[in-house]
Regions:
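Hydrophobic anchor at the beta1->P-loop junction of P-loop NTPases
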Residues: 5
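P-loop (Walker A) phosphate-binding loop of NTP-binding proteins
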Residues: 8
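Walker A/P-loop
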Residues: 14
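NTP-dependent small-molecule kinase module
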Residues: 19, 23, 107-108, 125, ...
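Conserved substrate/cofactor phosphate-moiety recognition/catalytic segment
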Residues: 22-60
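Hydrophobic/aromatic beta-strand patches that form the interior of the parallel beta-sheet core
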Residues: 29, 95-97, 147-149
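Glycine-rich phosphate-binding loop used to anchor ATP phosphates in small-molecule kinases
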Residues: 54-93, 99, 103, 152
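A glycine- and Lys/Arg-enriched "phosphate-lid" helix/loop adjacent to the NTP-binding pocket
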Residues: 92-137
Length: 168
């Protein structure tokens, strides 16, 4: 079994992924952490030194590596859907779960870590930036998911429970 979590930054992919993996006795990999370990640099540093395009290439390479694994829960980065190559890979997967949160929920979740998010840290209007990026990506998330879970006004346990029911 391979479960892939997608959705915007701050929707809880990593937190929820770890819990799902533990409950199902699967391995867990957070793609951003995987990239940081592989590159020996933080995501922020990679963005700063090489730009977003380079990071997206690293993300694609990492996705290709990770989907070779079985018995795993993979938490992707929020921008995984920005490249056509990744969309094609993810469309072929059997269990892609879209954690769907609105702008306000995402803003609430990210409020303490905006400086760690390269696409938000330099923004003059974080709420607007989140809204715009979410609008750009929403249809892509929606088009490749097998299961969509609305996370708005739900606690982690409710989201986990909904996922477990949906994957049977």
């Amino acid at each position: 079994m391979r479960i892939i979590l997608i959705g915007f930054m701050g929707v809880g992919k990593t937190t929820i992924g770890k819990i799902i993996a533990k409950k199902l006795k699967l391995n867990f990999v957070d793609m951003d952490n995987y990239i940081e370990k592989r590159e020996g640099k933080s995501i922020s540093k990679i963005f700063e030194e090489y730009g977003e395009q380079h990071f997206r290439e690293l993300e694609s390479e990492s996705l290709k590596d990770l989907i070779k694994s079985d018995n795993i829960v993979i938490s992707t980065g929020g921008g995984i859907v920005t490249t056509k190559q990744n969309l094609e890979i993810l469309k072929k997967e059997k269990i892609v779960i879209f954690l769907d949160g609105n702008t306000q929920t995402i803003l609430n979740h990210l409020s303490k870590e905006i400086d760690k998010r390269p696409l938000l840290s330099k923004s003059n209007n974080v709420e607007n930036t989140i809204s715009n990026l979410l609008n750009e990506r929403y249809e892509k998330y929606n088009s490749i998911c097998d299961i969509k879970i609305d996370i708005n006004e739900k606690n982690i346990e409710e989201v986990v429970s909904q996922i477990l029911v949906n994957i049977g």
